[in-house]
């Protein structure tokens, strides 16, 4: 029986970006199936803690600095550069609808964009 890993992703999430190549590299050395699970992180934030977006308008300096340091540490560890869009967070609803379409059609679109 093949083991399965559910991989939750939102194309606007820097954490998805950081982990994507890692899960694909892991699959090269381990036998498991990736179950792609598109989600809308913004929708989760809004339903669980709507203050997340409000706090971006008036960020706590120390929390923002730590968050940026944490992200920089992870980019260095992964050897990945993030080129942040001018507007962040972006609205990924349409792109994620496309992800659901490709899942319904059983097309692993995520694998089309890897260069390895």
What are the language-model segments listed below?
Residues 46-53:
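Short, glycine-/aromatic-enriched active-site segment of Class I SAM-dependent methyltransferases
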Residues 53-75:
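Short, structured active-site "lid" loops
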